[in-house]
Regions:
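Short, positively charged and aromatic/hydrophobic N-terminal segments
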Residues: 27, 43-44
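Catalytic glutamate of the conserved HExxH
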Residues: 216, 220, 224-226
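Bacterial N-terminal signal peptides
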Residues: 58-72
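Residue-identity detector for glycine
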Residues: 7, 18, 29, 40, ...
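N-terminal, motif-rich segments that launch catalysis or mediate targeting to/interaction with membranes
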Residues: 72-216, 230-327, 332-355
Length: 355
């Protein structure tokens, strides 16, 4: 019996199979191929035969090192878990007193806080269809989006414009539509809450739905307060660069992740929040205006990075700027939740009436 040659791919598959035995559950792509051995010969892994391990050991070390790097590589989560959680909790905490009491309870604050990073938990390669569908909902590159003309209110109308221009919607981003659609879900749930409360029904199930929608909405609103989620300059300057801004691909996570977790705190954010108010007019238009205001700060992020503002403790200017951005997100989220509650009182026609 002739044993096939053994290479790095075989070594990697055996390493995966070893992990499989530890986990005691199957790994996709690992098969139970018969071991390569002669009759009566004790089984040894091929990598240990004929000096194979010594020859492959340098490659084994390199592979192990690369694998460790993949485990440690951070994902691009706007504001990281800490920032998203703080924004959500502060928004719920500062809601006006005329919202239902359950929205301001400590249990609600904990639930909404937990849900702040939730859409970033939907970005695992284990759910590839979900990742592909929802990744564009975290950002919009306003430069190419605006080149197509006024932004339509409906997602599918915008996608049609993008396709007609020979582009792909997932490359441009779908942030304002995602946020507005979740806000409308929240408003619909609040309308149902009003109806159930008026009929003296148990409102706990719809309260759970309201908290979920509020927390889910919070993620996108927080993304919308991060300037690098509104531009083609999202992770290193592209195009003409007369000011010498970084072209590296570290600025996005450096700004919104470790720096926020280490230096920005909830009391400072709350102190910079605006007074609560209802949002007048069309919500989509108001949200796009919010994104455009955020986009005016793109170059400030690069200026602060150039001055070392996101390294270690940063600078007083970078801490102040980041705190203000998080406060803008928390204020907008609070006002959107409050507006959903007020708008949910407006009577609507039953879409199923007469059917």
């Amino acid at each position: 019996m002739t044993c096939p040659s053994y290479g790095l791919r075989d070594m990697f598959n055996e390493w995966r199979a070893g992990l499989n035995s530890l986990r005691e559950r199957p790994l996709l792509g690992v098969t139970d191929a018969p071991p390569c051995k002669r009759p009566g010969e004790p089984y040894t892994f091929p990598m240990f035969r004929n000096g194979g391990f010594l020859r492959l050991f340098p490659r084994f070390l390199a592979l192990s090192f690369l694998f460790c790097l993949t485990l440690q590589a951070p994902a691009a989560h706007a504001w990281g878990n800490e920032g998203h959680s703080m924004i959500n909790r502060l928004a719920a905490k500062t809601l006006p007193a005329d919202v239902p009491g359950f929205l301001r309870s400590e249990a609600a604050l904990k639930e909404v806080e937990y849900l702040g990073p939730e859409p970033d938990r939907w970005r695992s390669p284990s759910e590839p269809e979900l990742v592909a569908a929802q990744a564009p909902e975290h950002f919009i590159d306003l430069e190419p989006a605006d080149a197509l003309g006024p932004l339509p209110h409906k997602r599918l109308d915008f996608e049609a414009k993008v396709f007609a221009a020979g582009e792909r919607p997932e490359k441009v981003g779908l942030q304002p539509w995602a946020a507005t659609e979740v806000w409308e879900r929240l408003k619909a749930a609040m309308r149902q809450y009003r109806a159930m409360a008026a009929n003296h029904e148990d409102t706990r199930p719809v309260e759970d739905a309201i908290l979920f929608y509020a927390g889910w909405l919070g993620h996108y609103v927080a993304d919308g307060s991060q300037p690098l989620h509104t531009t083609i300059q999202y992770n290193g300057w592209v195009g003409p660069n007369p000011n010498g801004y970084t072209t590296g691909h570290q600025i996005h996570w450096q700004f919104e992740g470790p720096f926020v977790g280490a230096n920005i705190h909830a009391p400072e954010i709350e102190a910079k929040m605006t007074p609560a108010k209802a949002i007048d007019g069309d919500m989509f238009d108001s949200y796009v205006a919010y994104l455009r205001q955020t986009a005016t700060h793109v170059e400030t992020v690069y200026q602060l990075e150039k001055a070392g503002g996101f390294s270690g403790a940063g600078t007083a200017e970078s801490r102040k700027f980041t705190t203000e951005r998080l406060a803008a997100g928390a204020s907008m989220l609070r006002d959107m939740i409050y507006s959903a509650w007020l708008d949910s009182a407006i009577p609507v026609n039953d879409p199923y009436a007469g059917k």
